[in-house]
Design a protein with these regions (language model features):
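Small-residue-rich hydrophobic segments that form or flank transmembrane alpha-helices
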Residues: 1-45, 49-50, 103-110, 121-195
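Helix-coil boundary and interhelical linker segments in multi-pass alpha-helical membrane proteins
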Residues: 1-12, 59-68, 227
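Cytoplasmic juxtamembrane regions at transmembrane-helix boundaries
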Residues: 36-53, 203-221
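Transmembrane helix exit motif
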Residues: 22-35, 74-98, 192, 196, ...
């Protein structure tokens, strides 16, 4: 935005993105749950560790240079997408790791997602499908992970952050309320439509569709760094 420093713009964009994910995730969860594609047992086991990662990430995003993190995740997302598109059809691992391994995975998903302002899908879906987890349940469960990530992160950045002096109009904390109001109606409307389409695709096609979305996300992150 005109007159906003790159540092402030990055944090505000991250916080606003996380805030928009909250209502979008709720809409998506309801749609996926109606089709039986949300694994609540996995969510119950992962939620505390996702939350720990989110709280740490919400703090770190306000004190660290987000450019390098965005670059890292742009590379990771792009490579993961290419692997999903061109890699072998079988999962990399035969199943999810043990409890400690899953706790670490959950904490890392929460940490990194909250730091770059993304929902649960970008990291959760590849992580689960690489561990031979059913694609449809991975997508549905990732929607719920998105809520666990975005809600505490958005609250932290909304109320715990000091609004930058160069922030654009209608910014409270680090969240731009005008951007939130403009984006949310569309995301909430289209989330159930996306869930319905996803449920009708076979697993192989669903992975390819998600991989395309993921590579677009990765390239967008890289563009933020280099353009």
């Amino acid at each position: 935005a005109l007159g906003v420093s790159p540092e402030s713009a990055m944090v505000i964009a991250t916080a606003t993105s996380l805030a928009t994910i909250v209502p979008t995730s709720v809409s998506s969860i309801r749609a996926h749950h109606s089709k039986g594609n949300v694994d609540f047992a996995l969510l119950k086991a992962w939620a505390p560790f996702i939350l720990v990662g989110v709280l740490a990430g919400s703090y770190l995003v306000t004190v660290l240079n987000a450019t390098y993190l965005t670059l890292l995740f742009g590379v990771i997302a792009t490579l993961s997408a290419i692997n999903m598109l061109l890699g072998k059809k079988d999962a990399i691992f035969s199943s999810l790791p043990g409890r400690i391994g899953q706790w670490i995975m959950a904490a890392c998903i929460g940490l990194f997602s909250s730091m770059v302002g993304i929902g649960g899908g970008t990291l959760t879906v590849p992580t689960l499908t690489f561990c031979n987890y059913p694609a449809h349940r991975a997508v549905g469960t990732a929607a719920a992970v998105g809520l666990i990530i975005s809600l505490p992160a958005a609250i932290t950045l909304l109320f715990a952050g000091t609004t930058p002096i160069d922030a654009p109009f209608a910014t409270y904390g680090y969240v731009n309320l005008l951007g939130f109001i403009c984006i949310v109606p569309l995301t909430v409307f289209f989330a159930p439509i996306g869930a319905t389409i996803a449920s009708k695709l076979d697993a192989a096609m669903l992975k390819k569709v998600f991989a395309v979305v993921l590579i677009i996300t990765g390239l967008r992150m890289l563009a933020q760094v280099f353009l």
